[in-house]
């Protein structure tokens, strides 16, 4: 069977600071747009696509405590548990998870950092590493290297709940920097959006075809 692709569309709308300095770009909207477009392409290609949440519906927010940190932790826990529920339902070996984000170099003001990176958890399996490399190679193919040094493995390692607490191979993509004016122009353009979606699609398909 073809892989089941689980798409996690990043932060909720109430996550503070996740917008460009000029407030013309909001990460949660970008994550959802990429996720939905990617899901449609994968479905058309014959993959089963699942989401950690659907569209603008944000899980459990109406049930969460008022303490903001507790909200974030509960939402994040909901999302990685949802991935593991899908793994149990469809078989861990049949599932892949990609968590879609956009990056920022600082908490305020315009910055110099540019480019896309693909991240894995500290406990990443060989499958996750191979998956990350396949997607990052497509980022390079789309011209998204930016001005950062590229690790030899073509992936970055970080403490990430969506990668470390999920049972299937999992990656997290940080697509360009919304606090860099040049990257922001790409993120806001239709051409740039299509390239980002294609990067994910081609990377996923190439990885699946390599198995």
Regions found by a protein language model. Name each.
Residues 2-6, 11-116, 122, 126:
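Catalytic-core regions of hydrolytic enzymes
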Residues 3-8, 16-19, 89, 99, ...:
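Active-site-adjacent mobile loop/cap segments within catalytic or ligand-binding domains
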Residues 27, 31, 128, 132, ...:
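Short, charged, low-complexity patches
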Residues 42, 87, 135, 139-143, ...:
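Hydrophobic, Leu/Ile/Phe/Ala-enriched alpha-helical segments that form helix-helix packing faces
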Residues 127-154:
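Active-site-adjacent substrate-binding region
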